[in-house]
Every structure is written in structure tokens, then in C-alpha cells.
Amino acid sequence: MGSAGVASSSSDVAISALREKHEKEVENLTLTTQPLNTLKLFVEATIQYIKRSISYLLAHGGWFILITTLLVVSGGLLVTVDGPHGKHVEEVLEYVRYGLWWIALGVASSIGLGSGLHTFVLYLGPHIALFTLKATLCGRVDLKSAPYDTIQLKRVPSWLDKSCSEFGPPLMISAAGSRVPLTSILPQVQLEAILWGIGTALGELPPYFISRAASISGSTVDGMEELDGSSTEDSGFMATHLNRVKRWLLTHSQHLNFFTVLVLASVPNPLFDLAGIMCGQFGIPFWEFFLATLIGKAIIKTHIQTIFIICVCNNQLLDWMENELIWILSHVPGLASMLPGLTAKLHAMKEKYIDAPSPVPSHIKVKKWDFSFASIWNGIVWLMLLNFFVKIVTATAQRHLKKKQEKEMATLTHSD
């Protein structure tokens, strides 16, 4: 009995020591500390996933493979064979590229549990702002040559570099000076905003499916484990309060339903990744989760963001803000006498921007400025892409290492 107890105690100590060793190995596995080992595990995980996917498709996806092959062959023939259909095929391809581009940007924005690319700030937001400013400047919204005439990969919209005279005289001018109303601008950028929102909803599915699979197998997904084991003392002020809110959401998981998921998806917040994990962990039906996420992100949230940017860039809101600011300053002692001169200068600057023709510098100067701006912008995008790639590679390698460690731990426990 005594020897058995000693053996059991030494076995527990060995398992505990191995578990601590495994945790340290996972923590230290990053591209900065162990680049070769991290890349090796990432490649192993990728190959394993591809093999598993191919095996599954060969075993269960006979009809899927057949239909996909037929569609690819038909599409290839339509694209390569010349004929009267060529123009229509090219138009369809433009719409496909346009749709895939904005959906992919949405997926990239939301995938990776908060570590994704901020594509709204990089692409959709600037696109809406530039279109609004151009429409306000030209006094009309018929700027696009087609719905897909937007910012895309290696492509600038045709309307961006055109002067207002090329579109014709302004069509929307009112006595108040608000040239283009919100209701006219919104439909022009609405489709790409909704497509981006659909992409963000699709990007929330992997955490749900991973958590759902973990729940069915009886285990807990990484995000839930980290939340359970996280301490509020080792974080900053914001992280501490965010963890408290997450814990509150975790303890009130019985309230998760269509409406609560819809509310969480509709408002920009850092809690939705956790909500997706919890919905999978606690068995919320897929369609209930996905439809609430889709409506919240693709309809409500994107419209809130789009309308906000249009209002900020629209002349109407600027006029309202100017009037409110003047009213506030008029009540400040000493500033009331300065207001007429300040207002006149503001109006002169605004009229100069809106009504004066844009200066035409020399061809060389334009090229230099474009090159400089493009270089800075591309540098920012590439830095964010690099950061995104590093996070994905590290997370995949760490997950693969954890699976290996679990097998090692299971072998050790069974051998005892």
C-alpha cells in the first residue's frame, strides 16, 4: 500500500512537472524567439489540415467535387473561348472580383479573435470618406462608372482623379449650402459596406465551430480556458475591466439568445469574439447564431459606421458643427468680438476648397507626390499584413504543439 502511494505521488509530481514544462514551451513558441521551430510546426499543421480536408472530400464529397469540377471547366471555357458572350463574361467577372474583394476584407477584419486586419480603417472607411468628399465637392453622386468602380487590389476608382467638370455641373445645390444629402450618398456606397459586413460575419464562424467541436468532444476551447485562468492583477486598467465584463458575460451565459447575439454584433465592441466562443460552447444553434451575427454586422453595424463617416465628411454636418461652435463661443467672454472675423475666414477657406478649381502642378511633381503617398500607404498596409501573418502563424504553431503535448500527456497517463 505504502509503495503504491509513493508511486502514485511521484507519478502526479511527474505529470505536474511535465504540464508546467508544456505551458512554458507553448509560451516561448513565437516567431521572434523560435522562428525555425514555429515555422516547422506551422507547416506541419497546414499539411495535416490539407490532408484531412482532401480525405474528407474524397470520402463524403463526391457530388461536391463533381459539381465544382463542372463549374470550373465551364467557367474556364467561357473565359478562354472568344465570342459575343465575352463582354458579358468580363462584366460578370468584374462583379465577382468586386464581391470577393469586399467580403475577403470583411473576413480579414474579424478573423483571428481580434487580431485581424483593421480593413474598415484601411479600405472601407477611406473609400466612403473619399466618395463623400468628392460628391460634396462636385454636387452630384453619379460619379461611378459602375457599381464595382471602387478601391480594389491594385486598382484606384476612376472617379477619384477626375475633375468635377468631367462629370458635369452640380445637380444638388440648396440655399443652405448643403450640397449632397445623406440619402443620396448612402446608396452609392451601401453595397460594398454590406458585402464587407457579410465578410465580418463569416469571419466569426471559425471561433463558433471550434468551440462547438470542443463542446461536443467534452473539452474547453482555448479562449474559455484563458479567461478562466486569467488574473485581473497582471493586466492594465482597461484589460482588467474588460476581463471583468467578460467574466460577467460568462456567468450570465444562460441569457445568450438571438436578441443578445444581435445586440453584441450590432455595436462595435471587443466582446463579440467571446460571445461566438460561448455560443459554440453552450450549444446555441448555428442558424440562430449566424443569422443574428449576419443581421447585426452586415446590416446594423455597417450602416451605423457608414452613416457616421458620411455625416462627418458631409458639408451639411460641417455647417451644423460650425453653427453650434459659433453659438458656444459667442457665450464665452472675450471671444464674441472675434467671432465675425473668424467666421469670415472659415467661410473663405471653405469656399476656396469647394468652389475654386484645383491647381494643376507639373507632371513631375504629381508623380513624386503620388509615389510618396502610395509608398507610405503601402508600407502601413504591409506592416499590418505582416503583423497579421505573424499572429496567425504563431497561433497555428502553438495549437499544433498543444495537440502534440496532449498526446504525450495521454500516453504518460495511460502507461501509469
From Swiss-Prot:
Topological relation to the membrane, as annotated: Multi-pass membrane protein
Record field: transmembrane: 61-81, 102-124, 258-278, 290-312, 324-344, 373-393
Superkingdom: Eukaryota
Residue spans, topological domain Cytoplasmic: 2-60, 125-257, 313-323, 394-416
Positions on the Lumenal side per record topology: 82-101, 279-289, 345-372
Modified sites of kind N-acetylglycine: 2
UniProt entry tagged with the keyword Transit peptide: no
GO CC field: endoplasmic reticulum; endoplasmic reticulum membrane
The entry's keywords: Acetylation, Endoplasmic reticulum, ER-Golgi transport, Membrane, Transmembrane, Transmembrane helix, Transport
Annotated localization: Endoplasmic reticulum membrane
UniProt GO BP: endomembrane system organization; vesicle-mediated transport
Coiled-coil residues: none
Keyword Transport in annotation: yes
Entry function: Involved in the early secretory pathway. Required for the correct export of secretory products from the endoplasmic reticulum (ER) and involved in the maintenance of ER integrity.
Family: Belongs to the VMP1 family.
UniProt protein name: Vacuole membrane protein KMS1
Organism of derivation: Arabidopsis thaliana
